[in-house]
């Protein structure tokens, strides 16, 4: 059988710079800059058709994908209080060289998804985060971010929208967690956590050849975890994912009318994990 071989260089210069200015014991400012690499995954590069666990589209990898390079700049203000309380404000900017995006096309009347490198793109946004102890052993944490993205497409390409947000990037992201962690003696501890996530509408697959972009609609998820340390060695864990079990909904733009139509919806279901661990 014929085989294809693809080699990717691991010799990449990835510098990082971190600076911190301490205003006083409670307040500080941090600045960071870095160059990172996004390498194509095996699934994104494998040149054969496969079916995802969820959804109806078939996917074919692209063995001509190139590494994407990211230039990241972050400025963060932090204020710390008593009992681990904290509030922070972060502004960030990212320049994306050859970002990898998921695209769609029609093949024999069926929808086919694959992957391509865009020319370049950018992302800029702000994030607010806080942690607060409400009462003893009960803590609340949350963060909210807004992000603007834009991508430049190859000249003469078949993309339907010549200017648009970056595929896979949600403009609004929010997370909140409520944790309760009482101790019973020196070794036993209970850990309960309720975790909420909001992911704003985002492009799931980029439209080409007059096909509109497919967008995943805003999604809310709620998870629960519980753990109990019996002693220094033994612990129990329970994880419940997606308590809300909301529909994952996809809508596609219709370029000729400027409207959207629903093309797919499914539920992933609620799943449970129970674990037992032993530490030496």
Question: Model segments located where?
Answer:
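Outer membrane beta-barrel strand-and-loop segments of large Gram-negative receptors
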Residues: 60-62, 66, 72, 79, ...
